[in-house]
């Protein structure tokens, strides 16, 4: 069982890195040209400036009017960082948003079209932004020692600037924090790394290391990242890759506590994370595999045990990732509406009686089978809303979303 997002995100990440380098090179070249022009113009205008100053030195100008502050929802109990981003946004009854990578958050070409979708009343009212991604990269500098020592800090976007922009538009902000898959921390601190039976660092099929889920010391680092994101003013923390590995040679893994039941391990981590974070006034959620409510996948994800711990769960019920015949549907990928409805039925049954909202990840990309566009995405949205979802998020690794999918999506069946 492979998480398709690994390769998809890796490809998108590499492309984003290439675009970022090209943009920096172009920006540097433009800056040098501007500096040369400014120096030349300054030399030409220097005599004029001196004469103008001699004429106006004794005249005073009224002070400029202060800039009108952005509306906020701050309270005296909020941190300076929270107030800087306009306070927290209350959790919507029905969350409607999209996935945004760290590089998309830093790219006006990608971020501006996403922000144009914002309409808290009848359209997009939430935005999920990567803080710590599946490679272990943290999108900005933090005071966390292991983040610094491991080289995980990438300084991709300015979190306060991005959060202030999102909150000013009325958007509920969700920080995505990848937990156990991490290409940086295990190499800087092997004591918390997932190891092989020979003692080497274990790596998955993409060559990425992992933190050991059974070593509770390994839990501290992702929780610290989440705490810092909460301190900055994110409204919700979503933990992803909060599971055991699903690819790579699992037969060579030597867990620190191999006898610990997997469901108990993941449940305990999320309970500890939730208890740590909620006093900061932030909501806590997790992304789970789509079939985690249908079968025990052997990766520790058992939503029924978390029904009163998490504020929300985000099952990845992308239609194209179910095998033919799943839910009694001939080709789930070609039948998006019924597939979402069937998957949601399992999730509602598994979490029945709890306070945890179900907000599925929906598919806005094509992967075999039919092409996915506005119609197919809207079919999924309609099915999710009809079956009692507490909202949904759209996934596209390139962060380019189908037009018109948010039109009038108020959450009514």
Language-model segment annotations:
Residues 310-324, 332-413:
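Substrate-binding cleft of secreted/luminal carbohydrate-active enzymes
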Residues 140-150, 182-204, 247-258:
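Aromatic- and acidic-residue-enriched segments that line the glycan-binding/catalytic groove
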Residues 99, 172-182, 238-239, 245, ...:
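Aromatic-lined carbohydrate-recognition surfaces of secreted/lumenal glycan-active proteins
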Residues 126-128, 157-202, 238:
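Glycine-rich, aromatic-flanked loop segments that form ligand/cofactor-binding clefts
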Residues 1-30:
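N-terminal targeting leaders characterized by basic, low-complexity, disordered sequences
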Residues 127, 166, 173, 222, ...:
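Conserved, mostly hydrophobic/aromatic
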Residues 111-137, 230-237, 308-312, 384-392:
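Catalytic domains of carbohydrate-active enzymes, especially glycoside hydrolases
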Residues 86-105, 180-228:
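Active-site-adjacent "subsite" loops/lids of carbohydrate-active enzymes
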